[in-house]
Amino acid sequence: MATDSVYRVTEVIGVSSESWAQAARNAVETAAKSVRDLRVAEVVRQDVTIQEGAVVNFRVRLAMSFKYESGE
């Protein structure tokens, strides 16, 4: 029998000097250390930081969902 569930969505930004994929992994791995039961991460936005005409960081904004625990 299925039970009703509620999920919370929060946004995080991952940063990497290597790639957008690594930036996303960094965000998920870091969030997983303090948030239980992560379910889905959706890429909301990608951008880069630039210094002296060169890309120095890849940034990914993720909307991450996790199951809400009511405390009951």
PLM feature segments, named:
Residues 1-3, 50-53:
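Short beta-strand/turn micro-motifs at beta-sheet edges
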Residues 4-40:
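Short, well-ordered alpha-helical segments
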Residues 7-9, 45, 57-63:
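Broad gene-expression machinery/nucleic-acid interaction feature
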Residues 17-19, 48, 67-71:
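Generic "edge-of-domain/loop-turn" microfeature
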Residues 41-50:
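Short, conserved loop-to-beta-strand elements that form functional interface hotspots
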Residues 53-72:
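C-terminal structural segments of small proteins and small subunits
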